Amino acid sequence: IALCDHPEIEEILTRLVEMGYSISPASLRLDDITPTILRLLRQSGEKTITIAPETGSDRLRRVVNKTLTNDEILDAADMIFESGMENLKLYFMIGIPTETDDDLVAIRDLTLQLRERMMKYARTRGHIGRIIGSVNPLVPKPGTAYQWLAMEDDRSIERKIVRIRSLMAGIDNVYFNIKSERHSFYQALLSLGDRRVAPVIEAGHRNGGKWR
């Protein structure tokens, strides 16, 4: 359940702000963001909003059943930065079925457009924030459309990781954290494994959290 799903979320946030609480949501669904919610979060001291475009292209977003468009994402970014927010965190996925190099380039292009929105408002404040991206290989999860999908092979994911790092290199005020294919394999093991995985988890714990 997303934060903004609560029918009285604006009233709840208003009361929390009045009580002096700092409010820092993990992430916000773009289609639920309102100027009032952003204003209240900013009043509570929050400077960063996290959103999940998932992909850089509208086409690939539809593959994962997301109907949000890049234009809508950019409009939401205008609202976010206009509210006084300084930083924007982004969640992206790679390894989605039908993904091509054009889709990887689209991550860079969308990030650059979001950076332009940030810079427009930063100039009026005299302070430049940051765009912080997180890229994760697709991990099939139970109960989703891709729960039976095999993960993309390690070499293919590694090539895409190298490509993303190359595309994002040298962009001022933009920082990307890209999870390794090994880390994603561990996620898949924990998400999809049954009781037979228990001895592996126990062994990893005995080994100080190291899975090798």
Predicted regions and their residues:
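Auxiliary Fe-S-binding modules of radical SAM enzymes
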Residues: 105-212
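Conserved SAM/AdoMet-binding glycine-rich loop
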Residues: 1-89, 94-130
